[in-house]
C-alpha cells in the first residue's frame, strides 16, 4: 500500500521522514494501519481512555470492511456517515479508500460494504479501477464466505447510470458472495436514499451480531489537519473573485478563463491535486425566459426544502437549469401530454439523445405547455456545485486559489446558451464580487513524497490546471526530480494556456521536457497521445526509472486514448504483450504511480 503524500510545507515532517514513514507502512493491512494509528494516538493521549484498535475477539461478529470509492467526494461522505452509524451501534468497522485497499485480501472478508460512484462512460472512480479490474479478472477469488452490500451513486443524465455499483454488486454475487440487502442506486439528490440505506445496513448487521461489544475500530488512512475546515460543500466559504482573465486568443474557438479567488483570512487550505467546489447562480435572463414560456410571472410561491420562496428565486439559486436529463424529458412529456415528446417515452436511447441536445428551456420552447409553479419545481433536479481542478499551490499564492475555467457556450437555433457555473464565473460575477466555494480533497492525485521522483504530466486543454499547481509546489519545495509536460490544444498562437509560465519553467530548468500537440495547426491532426507514442522510448526510460504518471482532462475520449497509447508504449519498449502491459499499468495504479483526474 502506498499512502499519498501530504503537503510537506504544512506538516512537521521533512521529505525524508515522510519517505521512511511510507516505507514502514507499505505492507500493512488496513486493520494493522488502524491499530498503528490508534497506538500513536494513545501514546499522545495517555489519559484519554482511548481503546486501541484490535481484531474482534473470538466468537464475536467479524469486523465490517467499508470501502469508499469516490470521484467527487459524495461517496466518501456517505461512507463516513455509515462508519459513524456503525460505530454508534457498537459494531466493529474499518473504513478504507478503494485506492488504499489491498484487494487481494478480499477473499478473507466476512462482511464487505462498498459505497461507489460512477464516472465517464460507466467506469468506476479512479481510486477503484484496480479493485474493479481485479474482480473482473481470472485472478478473482471465490467469495462464498463473504456477505456484502453496495450503495451506488450516479446521475440519471448519463447513459450508464450507477454502472460501477451495478458492476460491483453483480460480480460479488457471481463470485459467491451473499447479499446483505439489495443494491441501492441513487441519483444526484442522494441524501434521502443514503440515509434510509444506512439505517438498513445497521439493522441487518446488528441482527447478525451475537453480542453487543464495545466498538473497537476507526477509519484507516492518513490523518492530515489540512482536511479539517469549517467550510464544506453544505457550508461553503463566501470568498472574493479577484481576477477573471481570458487566456485564449481573440480568434480562438475556446473561451478559457484564469480565475483567481481570494480566500481572505478564512484559513482554508488545499493541496495540489485538490478541486475547488463552486456554488453558482443561474442566469436571471434564463430564468425569466423559462418562466415566461410557461405563462408564469416568477413571484408564485413554491416550497423548497420546507421553505416558501418566490419561483424566480428558487430557480436562480436552487435548481439545475442548464443540464437536461432523460427523466426530466419523460416526466415533462407525461405531465404535459406533449404530442412531440410522448413518442419518446419508454425509448431510453431517444430520451438520452434528446436530453443531451436540448436544454430544459428549449424543450419547453419547442413543446410549450401551461404548468403551475410547484409542478415545474417538482420536475427539476437540485442545483449542485461544479468542481474545478485547482491550478495553484498555496506555497506560492498563499490565501488565494486559482482555477482554469473552460466557458461552455453554444447556440440552439440561433439562441445563445451557456454552462451554468462557467458562465457565472466568466460573465456574471464582477471582480471583487462574492462566490461561494469549498475544497474537495483528492488524495488520489498527489505529487510523489520523494522530491527526487520524476513526474510525467499529461493534460490537454483545461486539463493543464493541476499541473500548474504541481510545478508551483515543486518549485517551492526545491524538488530536484525531473518534470515532463505533455499539453495539447487546437492552435499554438491562440490556445497555449499559461505559455509564458511554461517557457519560464523550461528556461529555469524546472521543466525538463515539454511536448506540445496542436491538433489544427497542420493538415494531419496531432493529439497528446500521438506525442506519447512519438516519445515512446524516452517515456519508457522515465517510467522504468520510477516516474509517476498523471493524466487530467476529458474522461470520455482523451483519457481512454492516452491510456491506450501508454499501454502500447509499455508493450513495445518494455518487451511485453498488451495483456502484460495492462497488468503492469494496473500495478502502477496500485502503487500510486499512475493517477488520473478525469471528468
Curated annotation (Swiss-Prot):
HAMAP family for the chain: CysJ
Record-listed FAD binding positions: 322, 356, 386-389, 404-406, 410, 419-422, 599
Record: residues binding FMN: 70-75, 117-120, 153-162
Protein name: Sulfite reductase [NADPH] flavoprotein alpha-component
Enzyme class: oxidoreductase
GO cellular component, one term: cytosol
Function: Component of the sulfite reductase complex that catalyzes the 6-electron reduction of sulfite to sulfide. This is one of several activities required for the biosynthesis of L-cysteine from sulfate. The flavoprotein component catalyzes the electron flow from NADPH -> FAD -> FMN to the hemoprotein component.
Binding-site residues for NADP(+), renumbered to this chain: 519-520, 525-529, 561
Gene: cysJ
Signal peptide start-end: none
Domain FAD-binding FR-type: 234-448
GO molecular function, a single term: flavin adenine dinucleotide binding
Record note on quaternary structure: Alpha(8)-beta(8). The alpha component is a flavoprotein, the beta component is a hemoprotein.
EC code: 1.8.1.2
Amino acid at each position: 500500500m502506498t499512502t499519498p503524500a501530504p503537503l510537506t510545507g504544512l506538516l512537521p515532517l521533512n521529505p525524508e521522514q515522510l519517505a521512511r514513514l511510507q516505507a514502514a507502512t507499505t505492507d500493512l493491512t488496513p486493520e494493522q494501519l488502524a491499530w498503528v494509528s490508534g497506538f500513536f494516538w494513545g501514546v499522545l493521549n495517555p489519559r484519554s481512555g482511548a481503546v486501541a484498535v484490535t481484531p474482534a475477539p473470538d466468537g464475536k461478529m467479524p469486523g465490517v470492511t467499508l470501502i469508499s470509492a469516490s470521484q467527487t467526494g459524495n461517496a466518501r461522505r456517505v461512507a463516513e456517515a455509515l462508519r459513524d452509524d456503525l460505530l454508534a451501534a457498537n459494531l466493529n468497522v474499518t473504513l478504507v479508500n478503494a485506492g488504499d485497499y489491498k484487494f487481494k485480501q478480499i477473499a478473507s472478508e466476512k462482511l464487505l460494504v462498498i459505497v461507489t460512484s460512477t464516472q465517464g462512460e460507466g467506469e468506476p472512480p479512479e481510486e477503484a479501477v484496480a479493485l474493479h479490474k481485479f474482480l473482473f479478472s481470472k485472478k478473482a477469488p471465490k467469495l462464498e464466505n463473504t456477505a456484502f452490500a453496495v450503495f451506488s451513486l450516479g446521475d440519471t443524465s448519463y447513459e450508464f447510470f450507477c454502472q460501477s455499483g451495478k458492476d460491483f454488486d453483480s460480480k460479488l454475487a457471481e463470485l459467491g458472495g451473499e447479499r446483505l440487502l439489495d443494491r441501492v442506486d441513487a441519483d444526484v439528490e442522494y441524501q434521502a436514499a443514503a440515509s434510509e440505506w444506512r439505517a438498513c445496513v445497521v439493522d441487518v448487521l446488528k441482527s447478525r451480531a451475537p453480542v453487543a461489544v464495545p466498538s473497537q475500530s476507526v477509519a484507516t488512512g492518513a490523518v492530515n489537519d489540512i482536511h479539517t475546515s469549517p467550510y464544506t460543500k453544505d457550508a461553503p466559504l463566501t470568498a472574493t473573485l479577484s481576477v477573471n482573465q481570458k487566456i485564449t486568443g481573440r480568434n480562438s474557438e475556446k473561451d478559457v478563463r484564469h480565475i483567481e479567488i481570494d480566500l481572505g483570512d478564512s484559513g482554508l487550505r488545499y493541496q495540489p491535486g485538490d478541486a475547488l467546489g463552486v456554488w453558482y447562480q443561474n442566469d436571471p435572463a434564463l430564468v425569466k425566459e423559462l418562466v415566461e414560456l410557461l405563462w408564469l410571472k416568477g413571484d408564485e410561491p413554491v416550497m423548497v426544502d420546507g421553505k416558501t420562496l418566490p419561483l424566480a428565486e428558487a430557480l436562480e439559486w436552487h435548481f439545475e437549469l442548464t443540464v437536461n436529463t432523460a427523466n426530466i424529458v419523460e416526466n415533462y412529456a407525461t405531465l404535459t401530454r406533449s404530442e412531440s415528446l410522448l413518442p419518446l417515452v419508454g425509448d431510453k436511447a431517444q430520451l438520452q439523445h434528446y436530453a443531451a441536445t436540448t436544454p430544459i428551456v428549449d424543450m419547453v420552447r419547442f413543446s410549450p405547455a401551461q404548468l403551475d409553479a410547484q409542478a415545474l419545481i417538482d420536475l427539476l433536479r437540485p442545483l449542485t456545485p461544479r468542481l474545478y481542478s485547482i491550478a495553484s499551490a498555496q506555497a506560492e499564492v498563499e490565501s488565494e486559489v486559482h482555477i482554469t475555467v473552460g466557458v461552455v457556450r453554444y447556440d440552439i437555433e440561433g439562441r445563445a446558451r451557456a454552462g451554468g457555473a462557467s458562465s457565472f464565473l466568466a460573465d456574471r460575477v464582477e471582480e471583487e464580487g462574492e462566490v461561494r466555494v469549498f475544497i474537495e480533497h483528492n488524495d488520489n492525485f498527489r505529487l510523489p513524497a520523494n522530491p527526487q521522483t520524476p513526474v510525467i504530466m499529461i493534460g490537454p486543454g483545461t486539463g493543464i490546471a493541476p499541473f500548474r499547481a504541481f510545478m508551483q509546489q515543486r518549485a517551492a519545495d526545491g524538488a530536484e526530480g525531473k518534470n515532463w509536460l505533455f499539453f495539447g490544444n487546437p492552435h499554438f498562437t491562440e490556445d497555449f494556456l499559461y505559455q509564458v509560465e511554461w517557457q519560464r519553467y523550461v528556461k529555469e530548468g524546472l521543466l525538463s521536457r515539454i511536448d506540445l500537440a496542436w491538433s489544427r495547426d497542420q493538415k494531419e491532426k496531432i493529439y497528446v497521445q500521438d506525442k506519447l507514442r512519438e516519445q515512446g522510448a524516452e517515456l519508457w526510460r522515465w517510467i522504468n526509472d520510477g516516474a509517476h504518471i498523471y493524466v487530467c482532462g476529458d474522461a470520455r475520449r482523451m483519457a481512454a486514448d492516452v491510456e491506450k497509447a501508454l499501454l502500447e508504449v509499455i508493450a513495445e519498449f518494455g518487451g511485453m504483450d498488451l495483456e502484460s502491459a495492462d497488468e503492469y499499468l494496473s500495478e502502477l495504479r496500485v502503487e500510486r504511480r499512475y493517477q488520473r483526474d478525469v471528468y
